[in-house]
């Protein structure tokens, strides 16, 4: 029966690694960042201008008609004077041509831990990378659908900043055409990564105005600059959207390469996902929108929506708006903004285990203030939850160890007669009340928890650059000196010594190799995950040693 346990452990080791690779196949993005050395070490700033370009190109503005192709627009030069906006959590630049957000930094999230003053950059349109949030008015009279190109807005200032004590900042961009006055308004709130983008349409033209609001996210095929996992596992980089039938529908770059998507959706959201961060347009819940994905002539990927027809009578005024979220994947914040948006924190098929783990881990952290110690306490709680099951398993293993001399005698007695040997072993197990597969139960129980915790550490932005103690400065990446994996291998070896020795020499050799194999796997796993396994092993060793000693003492007493 020991061979079954050996095979099970080996299979679980292989399965766990294959599952990680499978996650990479299903959710990963093979493309790598196309940044030069200078770009990786210099802070991505917000320059005053961007190169002249083809911002009025057809690929930028969707058609208001769901059945037609994107509108063909004449090119127009970009403005060289970007409008810069700074709040306590956002630093961004708006191009007055079209009013697109072409650059956005997150000052609360450093790009690298060793350079805390260099903020992580989400949106960028400076040449190295294309990633921006666009919105406008298209349709019959929409200024973004003009043959002459997208509108050139004017602002009262070139820079805006949320002052100390100020809770809200409003930035107005103005444009007039054919008797219609437009205000594109950006509203920011202190401490918030979502902003309201609204259009105030004042029709003084003497005739009715008709158009549609659109909003979209445009990105090139470059890799994910926020992905720093060292396991060889890439997190999902691609688009996603909400529908009534599918609250979280992913649309990868490969899907967009195969063909455009168009769906009629009431409310919902469209988003672009990357490791730790998400950008999303959230229209009004009551609006019936046409959601679309496509690829433009420059090879950029676009996901967006076009809203319902807006009618403004002569002399009338109308306001329409949408929310834009650009920031970290904070589940509580995302859930407040729109149903299903919190699902962009993708824990995979074990989400039903991962979500309670994260909830508990978050509450522990609120008390301790350190994610490393929180993982240790979480491990102790999980171990306590499965204590009865583990205790039963260790008692079975201890009894196996106690009857080892009897098993050796049976082997000597029956020699190569495996049938009689197996029958005699089963009778002995039954007599001694031993479950030969009992030692496998803790591994079977721990593996789903282990994998769920892996995805919690991989996906939760709260773990990004979270230190523990001493050399562990980031629990979301590998131990830089491989100390924790080596300690884990040592604890596995000690735990193995407490187990009964397999009667077959080949099985014994395989079992001795397991700590080495697991140590090799764990060298590149997140330090937080290895910490969990080390603490779990230490608790298991203590529990197993105590139970084994008690049973051995009872056996000696009975024999006396």
UniProtKB/Swiss-Prot annotation:
Q: Name one GO biological process term.
A: protein transport
UniProtKB keywords = Cell inner membrane, Cell membrane, Chaperone, Membrane, Protein transport, Transmembrane, Transmembrane helix, Transport
User: Which parts pass through the membrane?
Assistant: 1-21, 341-361, 367-387, 437-457, 468-488, 515-535
| Gene3D superfamilies reported for this sequence | 2.70.98.90
Q: Which is a Pfam family this sequence falls into?
A: 60KD_IMP
Its localization reads:
Cell inner membrane
Q: Which domain of life is it from?
A: Bacteria
Under HAMAP family, the record lists: YidC_type1
Query: Tell me, what does this protein do in biology?
Result: Required for the insertion and/or proper folding and/or complex formation of integral membrane proteins into the membrane. Involved in integration of membrane proteins that insert both dependently and independently of the Sec translocase complex, as well as at least some lipoproteins. Aids folding of multispanning membrane proteins.
Descriptive protein name = Membrane protein insertase YidC
What phylogenetic lineage does the species belong to?
A: Bacteria, Pseudomonadati, Pseudomonadota, Gammaproteobacteria, Pseudomonadales
